[in-house]
Amino acid sequence: LISLFQEKMGEFVETIRQKTAGIESAVSKLFMLVETHFLLLSQNDPLAIVTQLELRQSNQDLRLKINEVLKGYLQVMDEILETGIKQGEFQADLNVRVARQMIFGTVDEVVTNWVMSDHKYDLVALSKTVHGLLIAACGYRQ
């Protein structure tokens, strides 16, 4: 289970990096991250179920392994947030660690609710709304 998660998460991080490579704006990069997260899981139901339900284990060893696998994804979020701060898109005193936790937690919870509702709605269609909430929380003002 962990090796499958590790492989898929590695592919996922690489996909995010490729899709955001030519984008200057942190706000646009964050949209790409959210949309890609939702798109990839909506296209792979078994992976969505595994990531949202099966990997929610209380076993400490398993949790540590999962956290290790997630580091690359969380690093991408940190890079986007730091870019946004440097470019003045996000508030200068933004706590990157807390903002990352907020982004990851929000995206994760939206996918979990989608899985638990038996996919009754279009997950990818929520990208714009979720992104808008996240950038507002990071201090973005148009």
Describe each region flagged by the PLM:
Residues 14-46, 99-103, 127:
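Hydrophobic alpha-helical connector segments
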